[in-house]
Amino acid sequence: LNDKISEIVDSELKNNNKAKKLIELLERISKMKFLDPACGSGNFLIIAYKELRRVEMRIYEELENLGEAQLYLEYVKLDQFYGIEIDNFASDVAMLSMWIADHQMNVELAEKLKSAARPTIPLKKIGGIYNANALRINWQEVCPRTEDEEVFIFGNPPYLGARLLNKEQNQEMEDIFKGVTQYKRLDYIGAWFYLGAKYIEHTNSKLSFVSTNSICQGEQVALMWKPILELVEISFAYTSFKWQNSAKA
């Protein structure tokens, strides 16, 4: 999005047309939705919300620089953000953390844009942080979307090898991978990729997960990626790197 802003600002368009394009970008951003189906205490959602708020601020700053200052309106809102978390305490923390992030960004807004004000109280509605099992709940019910809407799914699903799954987790894998041969050899995280692929199929939505490299090498490649690539295509990927996190698994 920052690249898109720079592209507009650096273009040969007249300032009023640049302003029009920037406002159109704000309107597009306001319709986006963001879902973390393994959100834990909300780290990824918090970062996404804060960065989107900063994009919004930058656009208003650019409008002012162009001599096309606009009355401040709220485009990025908490109700665009959704999460699923199986741990009750963590889901409560995620909800609270989003409200804290909202307050922090309201303070930052007041410092950057002197003419803008955005009250924290009363607390704003969050799209939904669901205390539920992401492999047992319909993601479409959590974060409803149409084919044209832009929904961005991201997160850090749990890492468990196929041999470490308990009885309940094995049953979840069986229910999700019906018709997929040798699913019992797949890591637990494969279920999030498969459900995510089904969610974004034939839509403008995107999905990106931090994942174990085991699903991208050895026997799991053919087992997992074949059914997924029948639904969607890969637009980008990163090579393996060391990842530190405080997740339980």
Go through each PLM region and give its residues.
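Conserved SAM-binding motif I beta-strand of class I
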Residues: 81-84
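Conserved SAM-binding loop
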Residues: 94
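Signature of N6-adenine DNA methyltransferases within the class I
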Residues: 46, 53, 91, 99, ...
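Class I S-adenosyl-L-methionine
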Residues: 1-71, 76, 86, 90, ...
